[in-house]
Amino acid sequence: RAGAYNSTTLIDCNTRKYHGQLVLPLAGELPEDNYVLLGSLDETVIQHGAEFNLGLHKYGWNNFSPNGHKYIREFDCEVISKTTYRVGGVILKKELLWIHKRTQLMIRYTLVDAHSETTLRLRPLLAFRDKHALSKANVEADGRAYPIPYGVKCRLYNGFPWLNMQLSKEDAEFIAAPDWYYNFEYQKELRRGYEGHEDLLTAGYFEFKIKKGESVIF
């Protein structure tokens, strides 16, 4: 085992600072510990110009947005984590797969059904922090995305490894749009008396068309 993990709630709403899409052990220039590199990955289904965001985050004053949990129709984790979403006539399945003995997570999206042209947008929200800390907006973070084959790589701070984000679909497009997202609230940290608000940085988003029956791996 390489020691990396993915941890969140069943509806993909992080409630603790230990939650993240990709958490892995690091050492070397950094103190030896687990680090959250990818905090969240927000998916958006687009049809006829209408956007349906599958993500879910909690902010202050009990505000949840964008309420993507309402599209969840099935969840199964008996062998691997599988979530099925239904948005109108669209049925999208998401599966989490780990590469054995490597700190590599693959997320497979399969368009099970759709009655019209469908586009999928993936927006990574980056943390690059110790699992015991919280990320705050700052001017030192490098919000640029650097091209690599089939995707981009990001590294917010020196001393961290590069985070390679790639897609199996050759014609997928990455749109650079660096920006901070503010005040994600982790309610279980607040209940324990700890700081529970975090800012996450996005370097941009991936966008690609997906056909019925097609699978694309992130």
Question: Model features per residue range: what roles?
Answer:
Residues 1-218:
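Terminal accessory carbohydrate-recognition/targeting modules of carbohydrate-active enzymes
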